[in-house]
């Protein structure tokens, strides 16, 4: 079992003001063209439009769930599960706003112990969930259990061990990278561990889609990222408010001067029962 300061790991225990920071980050990131393209690419590769019943684990505000529902070729049913009732309510609200409320269902639940009958879904998606899990192996076992024969899964997340934001001082850059990573994820190397974990859970890896989001000069995608990270790091107890504010100020100033550098590698794993 992992022990972590990661606020995303305990969204069922966060106060509403912190959950609003999480929700805003999920929506801003999810709507950015770079992130939306990665989602669309792996949904295409898993042939999501042909699936009758799809489960979105750790759905958050429903970014991936709604993206599937909006696809012109998708005619199936969708269920999103998240640990936080606050985020589930946000997901329902966004779905109604996009006139998708009759096509999607959102429920509160723990991905480690799903209250779902075995063999219920043709596809299971875990979009930006695995880096926040206490026990990835247990969640993989649940994904395998609720998947129908011939079904498909997709796991998409950041390889957060690769995430970096450059400051003027190299040593401080490394220190702050480590602190920020510790404050926003539970397992920064989980995507590197998936090949053996998927095999152990009874899955064969069908496809791996790597992508990298790097911004040089000016922060766009990463602007909302560093702003939210600076708010969450003190909550995690990894940095003080002053340290977080100074880090953010330096990065935004670098962006204003055209000197920003921020990067992270992402992977989508598509698997099927072995």
Residue ranges and their predicted role:
Residues 2-25, 29, 206-262:
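C-terminal helical/coil "lid" or tail adjacent to the Rossmann-like core of SAM-dependent
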Residues 32-50, 67:
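Conserved alpha-helix/loop element of class I SAM-dependent methyltransferases that forms part
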Residues 55-57, 61-113:
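Class I SAM-dependent methyltransferase SAM/SAH-binding core
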Residues 112-123:
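A short acidic, Gly/Pro-enriched loop at the edge of an enzyme's catalytic core
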Residues 122-135:
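A short SAM/SAH-binding and catalytic strip from SAM-dependent methyltransferases
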Residues 137-152:
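A short glycine-rich, Lys/Arg-flanked "PGG" loop and its adjoining helix->strand segment in the class I
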Residues 152-219:
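Conserved catalytic/acceptor-binding region of the Class I
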Residues 201-203, 266-274:
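Core SAM-dependent methyltransferase catalytic element
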